[in-house]
C-alpha cells in the first residue's frame, strides 16, 4: 500500500510543534505493515539546506504563476518529496510567519500550491512510476488537497484528513477564491465557502473520505460548540467518518537510555541516575541546589496552553518548596508575566524563551514533573515524552491528556497503574490543588518512584496507533 502524506512541516527538517513530530514518526511505524509513505512538504530554505542528496523527480511549468520542481530525498528514514518553488517558500522567516512574527499575506497561495501539487501527484503521474493508493493530509495547510482532487485529477482516490488542532482553520476572505484555481462550483457550502469566506480546513472536512483527529476524547469534544470552533455541525453530520487515534512518539529520538542531549542515561530500573540530569538542569537555569521537586513547562506560551495559570501559580510552587523551569515563547504578556515570576524568585524559577530541542530533552530528564494545564489539547506529545523520561505529567482533564495519563487517584494507586495527575476545573486554583497533590506524592519516595516507573513502562510508541491507521486505510480501499 502506498500513501502520500502531505504536511507543512516534518521533523527533523522543520518543526514549530507536534505536527512535525507526528508526520516524521508515523511512516516508520506503518512500514512493518507493508505501508510505504512518501511525505510531501514545502521547500523552505531550512528544508533544502538539510537535504544532502536530492534529485528532481517531477516538474510543474506553472504552479500558481511560477515553475516548481518536486525533489525526492530521504532523511532519518522518511521518504520525502519536497516542493521547491522559491517564489512561495524562499522566505527569511519561519514556515508561516515572517521575521516580525506576522502571517505571510500570501499564506493562502503558498498552501493552496502545496495542496494542488499533492492532487496532481496523486492523479496525474507527476512522479514517474509511482502513484499513491491513499492521500493523507494534515491540518488546514493541506486541506484543499481533497478539494482539488474532487474537481480534478483523482476524484475517486481515497483521502484522509487529520485534524491536529481545530483552532487553526485557514480562513481567508472571499477575494482570494479566484486565485485558487478551483471552479466556481467550489465556492459553496458543500466545499470551501464558510460564512462568506474561504475555509481551507472546512473544505477538507467536507470532501475527505475519512476524518481523523489525534485522540478519542478530542474526537468527541469537537462535536460540541465549546470545542468545535464553528465546525461542530459539519463534523456531527460526518460523525460516522470521524475517528480519534492517539499519537505516539519516536522511541529512538526520545529514549533516556541513549539520548545524546542528556549527561546521565537511565531506564525504568535505574531512576537514581536521573540525579545527574537534575544537576545539569539546575546549572542550566541557575537554580539553587536543594530538595523539593522541579516542575517544568515546555510549551507555546498561550492562553490555550493555560500558561496564564502557570504564571499565577508560580509563586505558590516556590512557597510550597518546589522549583520551576520554563521553555517557550508566544504571547508577549504571558512571556512577561513568567519572566517577572522568575525575577521575583531567582534561584527557584528559571526561564528560557524560544524553543531549544536539546534543552527540552534535558528538562524531561532532569525535572520531576511536567505541567500541562491546557484548556483544550487535541492529543499532546509533551506528556508522552514525560512518561518516557520519568517526568510525571500534571495535566488538565481534557482531550488527549485524559486519554494518555492515568490519574493517581486511590483506585489507580491501588491497582498500580497511575502515571500522573489530572485536575479539573482548569483554573489557577485547580492547578494549585494539583501541585499540592504532586508535593504530597513526591514526599513519599516509594510512591513517587512507582509513579515514574509505571509511566516509563507505558507503551507510548506508535505501534498500536499505526495498526489503527492501517485498519482505516484498508477499510477505505475495501470500499473501492
Curated annotation (Swiss-Prot):
Residues given in the record as ADP-alpha-D-glucose binding sites: 15
UniProt source species: Rhizobium meliloti (strain 1021) (Ensifer meliloti)
Keywords annotated in UniProt: Glycogen biosynthesis, Glycosyltransferase, Transferase
Gene3D superfamilies in the record: Glycogen Phosphorylase B (3.40.50.2000)
Pathway: Glycan biosynthesis; glycogen biosynthesis
One GO BP annotation of this record: glycogen biosynthetic process
Origin superkingdom: Bacteria
GO cellular component terms attached to this protein's record: cytosol
Family matches, as Pfam families: Glyco_transf_5 (PF08323), Glycos_transf_1 (PF00534)
Family per similarity comment: Belongs to the glycosyltransferase 1 family. Bacterial/plant glycogen synthase subfamily.
Disulphide bond pairs: none
UniProt function note: Synthesizes alpha-1,4-glucan chains using ADP-glucose.
UniProt xrefs under InterPro entries: Glyco_trans_1 (IPR001296), GS/SS (IPR011835), Starch_synth_cat_dom (IPR013534)
Protein name listed in UniProt: Glycogen synthase 1
Amino acid at each position: 500500500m502506498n500513501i502520500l502524506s502531505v504536511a507543512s512541516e516534518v521533523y527533523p527538517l522543520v518543526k514549530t510543534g507536534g505536527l512535525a513530530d507526528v508526520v516524521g514518526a508515523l511512516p516508520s511505524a506503518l512500514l512493518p505493515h507493508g505501508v510505504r509513505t512518501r511525505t510531501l512538504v514545502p521547500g523552505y530554505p531550512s528544508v533544502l539546506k538539510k537535504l544532502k542528496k536530492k534529485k528532481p523527480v517531477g516538474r510543474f511549468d506553472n504552479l500558481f504563476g511560477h515553475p516548481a520542481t518536486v525533489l525526492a530525498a530521504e532523511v532519518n528514514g522518511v521518504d520525502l518529496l519536497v516542493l521547491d518553488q522559491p517564489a512561495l517558500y524562499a522566505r527569511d522567516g519561519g514556515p508561516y510567519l515572517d521575521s516580525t512574527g506576522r502571517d505571510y499575506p500570501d499564506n493562502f497561495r503558498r498552501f493552496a500550491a502545496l495542496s494542488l501539487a499533492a492532487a496532481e501527484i496523486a492523479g496525474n503521474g507527476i512522479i514517474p512510476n509511482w502513484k499513491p493508493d491513499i492521500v493523507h493530509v494534515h491540518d488546514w495547510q493541506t486541506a484543499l488537497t481533497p478539494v482539488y482532487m474532487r474537481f480534478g485529477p483523482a476524484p475517486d482516490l481515497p483521502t484522509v484528513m487529520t485534524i491536529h488542532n481545530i483552532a487553526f482553520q485557514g480562513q481567508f476572505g472571499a477575494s482570494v477564491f479566484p486565485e485558487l484555481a478551483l471552479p466556481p462550483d467550489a465556492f459553496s457550502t458543500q466545499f470551501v465557502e464558510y460564512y462568506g469566506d474561504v475555509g481551507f480546513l472546512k473544505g477538507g472536512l467536507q470532501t475527505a473520505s475519512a476524518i481523523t483527529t489525534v485522540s478519542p476524547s478530542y474526537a468527541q469534544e469537537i462535536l460540541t460548540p465549546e470545542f468545535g470552533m464553528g465546525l461542530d455541525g459539519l463534523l456531527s453530520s460526518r460523525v460516522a467518518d470521524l475517528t480519534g487515534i492517539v499519537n505516539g512518539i519516536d522511541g529512538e529520538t526520545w529514549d533516556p537510555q541513549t539520548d545524546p542531549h542528556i549527561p546521565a542515561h537511565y531506564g525504568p530500573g535505574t531512576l537514581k541516575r536521573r540525579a545527574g540530569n537534575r544537576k545539569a538542569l539546575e546549572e542550566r537555569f541557575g537554580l539553587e541546589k536543594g530538595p523539593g521537586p522541579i516542575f517544568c513547562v515546555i510549551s507555546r506560551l498561550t492562553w490555550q496552553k493555560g500558561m496564564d495559570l502557570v504564571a499565577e501559580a508560580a509563586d505558590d510552587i516556590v512557597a510550597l518548596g518546589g522549583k520551576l523551569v520554563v521553555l517557550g515563547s508566544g504571547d508577549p504578556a504571558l512571556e512577561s508575566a513568567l519572566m517577572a515570576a522568575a525575577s521575583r524568585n531567582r534561584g527557584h524559577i528559571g526561564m528560557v524563551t524560544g524553543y531549544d530541542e536539546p534543552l527540552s530533552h534535558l528538562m524531561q530528564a532532569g525535572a520531576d514533573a511536567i505541567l500541562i494545564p491546557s484548556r483544550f489539547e487535541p492529543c499532546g506529545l509533551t506528556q508522552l515524552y514525560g512518561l518516557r523520561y520519568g517526568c510525571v505529567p500534571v495535566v488538565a482533564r481534557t482531550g488527549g491528556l485524559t486519554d494518555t495519563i492515568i490519574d493517581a487517584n486511590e483506585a489507580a494507586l491501588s491497582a498500580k497503574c497511575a502515571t500522573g495527575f489530572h485536575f479539573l476545573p482548569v483554573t489557577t486554583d485547580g492547578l494549585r490543588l494539583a501541585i499540592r497533590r504532586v508535593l504530597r506524592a513526591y514526599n513519599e519516595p516509594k510512591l513517587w518512584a512507582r509513579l515514574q516507573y509505571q509511566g516509563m513502562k507505558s507503551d507510548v510508541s506508535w505501534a498500536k496507533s499505526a495498526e489503527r491507521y492501517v485498519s482505516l486505510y484498508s477499510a477505505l480501499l475495501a470500499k473501492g
